[in-house]
From Swiss-Prot:
Alphabetical UniProt keywords: ATP-binding, GTP-binding, Nucleotide-binding
Binding annotation for GTP: 70-73
Superkingdom of this protein's organism: Bacteria
A GO MF label: ATP binding
One Pfam family matching this protein: RapZ-like_N
Residue numbers binding ATP: 19-26
Lineage per the UniProt record: Bacteria, Bacillati, Actinomycetota, Actinomycetes, Micrococcales
Protein's name in the database: Nucleotide-binding protein Lxx11490
Length: 295
Protein backbone atom coordinates (compact mmCIF):
# COMPACT_ATOMS: atom_id res chain seq x y z
CA UNK A 1 0.00 0.00 0.00
CA UNK A 2 1.34 3.45 -0.92
CA UNK A 3 1.37 6.03 1.84
CA UNK A 4 -0.12 9.51 1.43
CA UNK A 5 3.35 11.00 1.84
CA UNK A 6 4.76 8.92 -1.00
CA UNK A 7 1.82 9.72 -3.25
CA UNK A 8 2.16 13.45 -2.61
CA UNK A 9 5.91 13.31 -3.25
CA UNK A 10 5.33 11.87 -6.69
CA UNK A 11 3.15 14.89 -7.55
CA UNK A 12 5.49 17.41 -5.97
CA UNK A 13 8.03 19.54 -7.79
CA UNK A 14 11.27 20.65 -6.18
CA UNK A 15 13.51 23.33 -7.67
CA UNK A 16 17.02 23.67 -6.29
CA UNK A 17 18.44 27.14 -6.91
CA UNK A 18 22.20 27.46 -6.70
CA UNK A 19 25.09 29.10 -8.53
CA UNK A 20 27.70 31.80 -8.21
CA UNK A 21 27.67 34.25 -5.32
CA UNK A 22 26.46 37.58 -6.66
CA UNK A 23 24.61 36.03 -9.60
CA UNK A 24 21.15 36.86 -8.23
CA UNK A 25 19.90 34.04 -6.00
CA UNK A 26 17.92 36.40 -3.77
CA UNK A 27 16.25 38.04 -6.76
CA UNK A 28 15.29 34.63 -8.11
CA UNK A 29 13.90 33.59 -4.72
CA UNK A 30 11.65 36.66 -4.65
CA UNK A 31 10.49 36.06 -8.22
CA UNK A 32 9.59 32.45 -7.44
CA UNK A 33 7.63 33.53 -4.37
CA UNK A 34 5.63 35.87 -6.60
CA UNK A 35 4.81 32.80 -8.72
CA UNK A 36 3.45 31.00 -5.62
CA UNK A 37 6.41 28.73 -5.04
CA UNK A 38 7.19 27.92 -1.42
CA UNK A 39 10.75 29.26 -1.13
CA UNK A 40 13.34 28.46 1.51
CA UNK A 41 16.55 30.50 1.35
CA UNK A 42 20.05 29.38 2.39
CA UNK A 43 19.03 25.79 3.01
CA UNK A 44 21.81 23.28 3.78
CA UNK A 45 21.59 20.28 1.40
CA UNK A 46 21.05 17.91 4.33
CA UNK A 47 17.76 19.67 5.10
CA UNK A 48 16.21 19.09 1.66
CA UNK A 49 14.63 15.75 2.47
CA UNK A 50 13.25 16.83 5.88
CA UNK A 51 11.81 19.92 4.18
CA UNK A 52 10.00 17.81 1.58
CA UNK A 53 8.70 15.41 4.21
CA UNK A 54 7.37 18.29 6.31
CA UNK A 55 5.75 19.82 3.23
CA UNK A 56 4.05 16.53 2.43
CA UNK A 57 2.55 16.43 5.91
CA UNK A 58 1.12 19.93 5.55
CA UNK A 59 -2.67 19.89 5.47
CA UNK A 60 -2.95 21.60 2.08
CA UNK A 61 0.34 20.30 0.69
CA UNK A 62 3.04 22.32 -1.02
CA UNK A 63 3.20 21.20 -4.65
CA UNK A 64 6.07 23.51 -5.67
CA UNK A 65 9.06 23.99 -3.41
CA UNK A 66 12.13 26.05 -4.26
CA UNK A 67 15.22 25.67 -2.10
CA UNK A 68 18.03 28.20 -2.48
CA UNK A 69 21.10 26.16 -1.60
CA UNK A 70 24.58 27.44 -0.83
CA UNK A 71 27.15 24.78 -1.75
CA UNK A 72 30.37 26.71 -1.30
CA UNK A 73 31.52 24.37 1.45
CA UNK A 74 33.21 21.24 0.14
CA UNK A 75 31.04 18.93 2.24
CA UNK A 76 27.89 20.78 1.20
CA UNK A 77 28.79 20.26 -2.46
CA UNK A 78 29.13 16.49 -2.09
CA UNK A 79 25.99 16.36 0.04
CA UNK A 80 23.97 18.21 -2.60
CA UNK A 81 25.04 15.91 -5.42
CA UNK A 82 24.06 12.84 -3.41
CA UNK A 83 20.81 14.39 -2.23
CA UNK A 84 19.67 15.29 -5.76
CA UNK A 85 20.20 11.73 -6.96
CA UNK A 86 18.35 10.36 -3.96
CA UNK A 87 15.40 12.74 -4.27
CA UNK A 88 14.95 12.08 -7.98
CA UNK A 89 13.92 8.52 -7.20
CA UNK A 90 10.57 9.69 -5.86
CA UNK A 91 10.24 13.41 -6.58
CA UNK A 92 10.47 15.64 -9.61
CA UNK A 93 13.67 17.61 -8.98
CA UNK A 94 15.28 20.25 -11.17
CA UNK A 95 18.38 22.36 -10.62
CA UNK A 96 18.51 26.03 -11.62
CA UNK A 97 22.08 27.34 -11.82
CA UNK A 98 22.80 31.08 -11.85
CA UNK A 99 26.04 32.40 -13.22
CA UNK A 100 27.62 35.62 -14.45
CA UNK A 101 30.89 36.71 -16.02
CA UNK A 102 33.84 37.36 -13.72
CA UNK A 103 33.91 41.07 -14.53
CA UNK A 104 30.21 41.35 -13.68
CA UNK A 105 30.60 39.56 -10.34
CA UNK A 106 33.61 41.71 -9.41
CA UNK A 107 31.62 44.86 -10.16
CA UNK A 108 28.64 43.68 -8.11
CA UNK A 109 30.76 42.87 -5.07
CA UNK A 110 32.56 46.20 -5.35
CA UNK A 111 29.25 48.06 -5.54
CA UNK A 112 28.06 46.60 -2.23
CA UNK A 113 31.58 46.77 -0.72
CA UNK A 114 31.57 43.17 0.41
CA UNK A 115 34.28 40.51 0.09
CA UNK A 116 33.65 37.28 -1.78
CA UNK A 117 32.93 34.45 0.68
CA UNK A 118 35.83 32.37 -0.68
CA UNK A 119 38.48 35.03 -1.29
CA UNK A 120 40.14 34.71 2.12
CA UNK A 121 43.29 36.84 2.03
CA UNK A 122 43.22 36.97 -1.78
CA UNK A 123 41.36 39.16 -4.23
CA UNK A 124 37.73 39.16 -5.30
CA UNK A 125 38.75 37.41 -8.51
CA UNK A 126 40.56 34.72 -6.50
CA UNK A 127 37.35 33.97 -4.62
CA UNK A 128 35.25 33.93 -7.79
CA UNK A 129 37.70 31.61 -9.52
CA UNK A 130 37.71 29.21 -6.56
CA UNK A 131 33.92 29.15 -6.39
CA UNK A 132 33.55 28.62 -10.14
CA UNK A 133 35.89 25.63 -9.99
CA UNK A 134 34.03 24.18 -7.02
CA UNK A 135 30.65 24.54 -8.72
CA UNK A 136 31.70 23.25 -12.15
CA UNK A 137 30.25 19.78 -11.68
CA UNK A 138 26.92 20.95 -10.34
CA UNK A 139 26.67 23.45 -13.22
CA UNK A 140 27.22 20.70 -15.78
CA UNK A 141 24.44 18.59 -14.28
CA UNK A 142 21.95 21.47 -13.94
CA UNK A 143 18.64 21.43 -15.80
CA UNK A 144 18.45 25.20 -16.35
CA UNK A 145 21.32 27.68 -16.55
CA UNK A 146 20.66 31.41 -16.48
CA UNK A 147 23.46 33.87 -17.22
CA UNK A 148 22.69 37.11 -15.37
CA UNK A 149 25.67 39.10 -16.67
CA UNK A 150 23.56 41.49 -18.75
CA UNK A 151 20.45 41.48 -16.54
CA UNK A 152 19.45 43.92 -13.82
CA UNK A 153 17.26 42.68 -10.98
CA UNK A 154 14.04 43.54 -12.81
CA UNK A 155 15.14 41.82 -16.01
CA UNK A 156 16.22 38.75 -14.04
CA UNK A 157 12.84 38.57 -12.31
CA UNK A 158 11.16 38.81 -15.72
CA UNK A 159 13.39 36.03 -17.06
CA UNK A 160 12.42 33.74 -14.17
CA UNK A 161 8.76 34.55 -14.75
CA UNK A 162 9.16 33.72 -18.44
CA UNK A 163 10.67 30.35 -17.53
CA UNK A 164 8.28 29.24 -14.79
CA UNK A 165 5.00 31.17 -15.04
CA UNK A 166 3.35 29.24 -17.87
CA UNK A 167 4.67 25.76 -17.23
CA UNK A 168 1.20 24.31 -16.94
CA UNK A 169 0.23 25.52 -20.41
CA UNK A 170 3.25 24.48 -22.48
CA UNK A 171 5.65 21.59 -22.20
CA UNK A 172 8.80 23.46 -23.22
CA UNK A 173 9.56 27.17 -22.90
CA UNK A 174 11.84 27.95 -25.85
CA UNK A 175 13.94 31.11 -26.08
CA UNK A 176 15.48 31.82 -29.48
CA UNK A 177 18.41 34.20 -28.98
CA UNK A 178 20.50 35.98 -31.60
CA UNK A 179 24.05 36.95 -30.66
CA UNK A 180 27.39 38.10 -32.05
CA UNK A 181 30.32 35.70 -31.85
CA UNK A 182 32.70 38.61 -31.30
CA UNK A 183 30.96 39.25 -27.97
CA UNK A 184 31.22 35.63 -26.84
CA UNK A 185 28.95 32.61 -26.75
CA UNK A 186 25.82 32.86 -24.56
CA UNK A 187 26.62 30.91 -21.41
CA UNK A 188 23.03 29.76 -20.97
CA UNK A 189 22.53 28.39 -24.50
CA UNK A 190 21.44 24.76 -24.82
CA UNK A 191 21.89 24.70 -28.60
CA UNK A 192 24.03 26.96 -30.80
CA UNK A 193 23.63 27.57 -34.55
CA UNK A 194 26.15 29.47 -36.70
CA UNK A 195 24.72 31.76 -39.39
CA UNK A 196 28.12 33.01 -40.58
CA UNK A 197 27.97 30.70 -43.60
CA UNK A 198 25.61 33.24 -45.20
CA UNK A 199 26.87 36.40 -46.97
CA UNK A 200 27.10 39.31 -44.54
CA UNK A 201 24.72 42.23 -45.30
CA UNK A 202 27.20 44.45 -43.46
CA UNK A 203 29.25 44.59 -46.65
CA UNK A 204 26.34 45.97 -48.64
CA UNK A 205 26.36 49.74 -48.01
CA UNK A 206 22.63 50.04 -48.61
CA UNK A 207 21.90 47.39 -45.91
CA UNK A 208 24.56 48.22 -43.33
CA UNK A 209 22.47 50.76 -41.33
CA UNK A 210 19.59 48.30 -40.95
CA UNK A 211 19.19 45.17 -38.81
CA UNK A 212 17.72 41.72 -39.20
CA UNK A 213 14.46 43.11 -37.84
CA UNK A 214 14.07 45.24 -40.96
CA UNK A 215 12.31 43.58 -43.87
CA UNK A 216 14.94 44.62 -46.40
CA UNK A 217 17.68 42.82 -44.46
CA UNK A 218 15.52 39.88 -43.54
CA UNK A 219 14.57 39.28 -47.17
CA UNK A 220 18.19 39.57 -48.24
CA UNK A 221 19.33 36.99 -45.68
CA UNK A 222 16.52 34.51 -46.23
CA UNK A 223 16.87 34.48 -50.01
CA UNK A 224 20.56 33.55 -49.89
CA UNK A 225 21.57 30.10 -51.11
CA UNK A 226 21.41 27.67 -48.22
CA UNK A 227 19.29 29.80 -45.88
CA UNK A 228 16.00 27.96 -46.41
CA UNK A 229 17.71 24.58 -46.45
CA UNK A 230 19.45 25.40 -43.16
CA UNK A 231 16.24 26.51 -41.43
CA UNK A 232 14.27 23.47 -42.59
CA UNK A 233 17.08 21.06 -41.68
CA UNK A 234 17.52 22.66 -38.28
CA UNK A 235 13.79 22.47 -37.54
CA UNK A 236 13.82 18.80 -38.50
CA UNK A 237 16.73 18.19 -36.13
CA UNK A 238 14.94 20.05 -33.32
CA UNK A 239 11.78 17.92 -33.46
CA UNK A 240 13.26 14.80 -31.78
CA UNK A 241 15.21 17.01 -29.37
CA UNK A 242 12.06 18.73 -28.11
CA UNK A 243 10.23 15.41 -27.99
CA UNK A 244 13.02 14.14 -25.75
CA UNK A 245 12.86 17.28 -23.60
CA UNK A 246 9.15 16.66 -23.07
CA UNK A 247 9.74 13.03 -22.08
CA UNK A 248 12.45 14.07 -19.63
CA UNK A 249 10.41 17.00 -18.25
CA UNK A 250 12.97 19.57 -19.36
CA UNK A 251 10.81 22.66 -19.42
CA UNK A 252 13.16 25.32 -20.81
CA UNK A 253 15.55 25.51 -23.74
CA UNK A 254 17.59 28.32 -25.25
CA UNK A 255 18.55 28.17 -28.93
CA UNK A 256 21.30 30.65 -29.76
CA UNK A 257 21.85 31.76 -33.35
CA UNK A 258 25.08 33.63 -33.97
CA UNK A 259 26.73 35.73 -36.64
CA UNK A 260 29.74 38.04 -36.44
CA UNK A 261 28.18 41.03 -34.68
CA UNK A 262 24.65 39.88 -33.86
CA UNK A 263 23.02 42.56 -36.02
CA UNK A 264 22.00 41.14 -39.40
CA UNK A 265 22.15 37.42 -40.20
CA UNK A 266 21.60 35.97 -36.73
CA UNK A 267 18.68 38.33 -36.06
CA UNK A 268 16.95 37.47 -39.34
CA UNK A 269 17.47 33.73 -38.93
CA UNK A 270 16.40 33.80 -35.27
CA UNK A 271 13.19 35.66 -36.14
CA UNK A 272 12.34 33.18 -38.88
CA UNK A 273 13.22 30.18 -36.73
CA UNK A 274 11.08 31.45 -33.85
CA UNK A 275 8.14 32.08 -36.18
CA UNK A 276 8.25 28.51 -37.46
CA UNK A 277 8.78 26.99 -34.02
CA UNK A 278 5.56 28.64 -32.85
CA UNK A 279 3.66 26.34 -35.20
CA UNK A 280 4.90 23.24 -33.35
CA UNK A 281 2.71 21.81 -30.57
CA UNK A 282 3.79 21.93 -26.94
CA UNK A 283 6.14 24.90 -27.26
CA UNK A 284 5.94 28.46 -25.94
CA UNK A 285 8.43 30.47 -27.96
CA UNK A 286 9.99 33.83 -27.10
CA UNK A 287 12.81 35.68 -28.81
CA UNK A 288 15.73 37.75 -27.55
CA UNK A 289 18.38 39.69 -29.47
CA UNK A 290 21.30 39.81 -27.06
CA UNK A 291 23.71 42.05 -28.94
CA UNK A 292 21.42 44.13 -31.13
CA UNK A 293 22.37 47.79 -30.75
CA UNK A 294 25.65 46.93 -29.07
CA UNK A 295 27.90 47.95 -31.95
Amino acid sequence: MTSDVETTAEQQEVLIVTGMSGAGRSTVANALEDLDWYVVDNLPPQMLRPLIELANRAESGLPRIAAVVDVRGRNFFADLQEMIQSLREGTKVRVLFLEAADVTLVRRFEQVRRPHPLQGNGTLLDGITAERARLREIRESSDIIVDTSDLNIHQLATRITDIFADENTADVQVTVMSFGFKYGLPADADLVADARFLPNPFWKPELRPYTGLDEVVRNDVLQQNGAEEFIESYLEALRPIFAGYQRENKRHATIAVGCTGGKHRSVAIAEELAARLRSLPGLAVSIKHRDLGRE
